[in-house]
A protein has these predicted regions:
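Bacterial N-terminal signal peptides that target proteins for export
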Residues: 1-7
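C-terminal motif of bacterial Sec signal peptides marking the signal peptidase cleavage site
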Residues: 15-18
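OB-fold and OB-like single-stranded nucleic-acid-recognition modules
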Residues: 20-154
């Protein structure tokens, strides 16, 4: 391969990486605006994160709080079933965003696949906000249900 070909390949890679970063920054700006517009109140925002091999429910945050401040939770369904379980379609709501009613119990729950303890969120109600919400993960594969890594929102 000639030096010119190598230089072109390098510049194309840098250019494409820059485009991806610009797209991510633009998505984050839109997301920040929508979060800032949320009404304060006695509710939570939840993003379902389904993994075939894990038992976590997803990320939960307070209104007007960034997704980077959210917590990955285990859902207590003794009062209300999780939306996908209520529909008898486990995982069908992967990456769906919800307005959640409920509270953190103060307890942690062991999740065996990750060998971690996660906060317990007691669900008392929910409402779908969006089935196709803005991306909160840098990696576009973060919502793949077969993925063995749990990504953290940014």
């Amino acid at each position: 391969m000639s030096r010119v070909s190598l230089a072109i390949a390098f510049l194309a890679t840098v250019f494409l990486a820059g485009c991806v970063e610009d797209q991510w920054a633009a998505q984050q700006a839109v997301l920040a605006q929508s979060i800032a517009a949320e009404q304060p109140g006695d509710y939570f925002i939840g993003r379902r994160l389904y993994r075939r091999n894990f038992f976590v429910w997803g990320y939960v945050r307070k209104p007007q709080q960034s997704w980077s401040q959210s917590q990955l939770v285990m859902l207590n369904e003794q009062k209300v079933l999780a939306p996908d379980r209520a529909a008898n379609a486990i995982g069908s709501d992967n990456n769906t965003e919800y307005r959640l009613k409920g509270y953190f119990s103060g307890q942690t729950v062991y999740e065996p696949a990750s060998n971690h303890f996660y906060p317990e969120f007691v669900l008392t109600g929910y409402q779908v906000i969006s089935g196709n919400p803005p991306n909160i993960f840098r990696d576009p594969n973060a919502t793949d249900p077969n993925r063995l890594v749990i990504d953290k929102p940014e």
